[in-house]
Amino acid sequence: MWSLPPSRALSCAPLLLLFSFQFLVTYAWRFQEEEEWNDQKQIAVYLPPTLEFAVYTFNKQSKDWYAYKLVPVLASWKEQGYDKMTFSMNLQLGRTMCGKFEDDIDNCPFQESPELNNTCTCFFTIGIEPWRTRFDLWNKTCSGGHS
């Protein structure tokens, strides 16, 4: 059986500690990288229908006769720490020339009247259960326009 002399064994202890620490850091880094990749994949798949739900809900709750549609997504992110998959987003919505109950709102032009405020900015938090095709509006806060 092979063994190190006691003085050599003590000099190897810091080296072993360093290697085990490096292994833990590498594992944690790879785990975080994989988790971020999974988040990005979920965002790519589930954010578009969540945006559609947000705009649909805005139009449904709005007292305005005209439909609004998405101008740009100002910011969006996947929330952590909820039971359901949850997205928060800041959206800018523009007022269209179509009524909100018309069929083809996506192809409807925006109103461009300078005397009217035709855009509003809204913050939404929406929980989703994609396996059940269920969306729950948890927060909607809007400013400007006819919100």
Curated annotation (Swiss-Prot):
Give the positions annotated as glycosylation sites: N117, N139
Question: Which Gene Ontology BP annotations are present?
Answer: antimicrobial humoral response
Give the signal sequence positions: 1-28
Intrachain disulfide bonds: C98-C108, C122-C142
Q: Where is it located?
A: Secreted
Q: Which domain of life is it from?
A: Eukaryota
Record's GO cellular component terms: extracellular space
* Principal location listed in the UniProt entry: secreted
Q: Which controlled-vocabulary keywords does the entry list? A: Disulfide bond, Glycoprotein, Protease inhibitor, Secreted, Signal, Thiol protease inhibitor
Instruction: Kindly give the InterPro entries that the UniProt entry links to this protein.
Output: CST9-like (IPR043250), Cystatin_dom (IPR000010), Cystatin_sf (IPR046350)
Give any Pfam family that matches: Cystatin
Q: Name one GO molecular function term.
A: cysteine-type endopeptidase inhibitor activity
**Family from the record:** Belongs to the cystatin family.
State the name under which the record lists this protein: Putative cystatin-9-like protein CST9LP1
Organism field: Homo sapiens (Human)
Its lineage reads: Eukaryota, Metazoa, Chordata, Craniata, Vertebrata
